[in-house]
Amino acid sequence: MIANTATFLEALVELFPTCKAVYFQNSGKLFTAEAIRNHTIPRESRFIYFAVNVRFFNIQGTDDMMVDSLGMNTLFLPDLQYHFHEMEPNWVVNHAYNVLSYIFDNENPIESGDPIDGIVDGAMSREVMWRCQYENALIQPVRE
């Protein structure tokens, strides 16, 4: 079923040829129908690309930053949240997309307390391990 999600999207824009754009309510992403019709995204990456959004926030009055995701809950999979400082935020955004792809491809094998590869010089690395923790989202919308 998961593999057919993006195929369903492509079928919809073909069934409605006058469609101008598609808005993904769960993630807040908007794509033109033309972008969906003409994409070259590999099948296994389409759901993450089209239906999942990774957001970045500066925490006001601090040096802290936040990266989180929206959209995985569409398939009853967990979204991610990173609370950090003194790290390049684009590295964290890329890390989030990599972890989201892993969760999607493997039907969420990560449990609270499990270690995952961290980031060294912008790349995922086993030199630094991060511990996963399931908790409620700090930024709206409410999700677990």
Pin down the residues of each PLM region:
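Aromatic/basic-lined ligand-recognition segments
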Residues: S27-E144
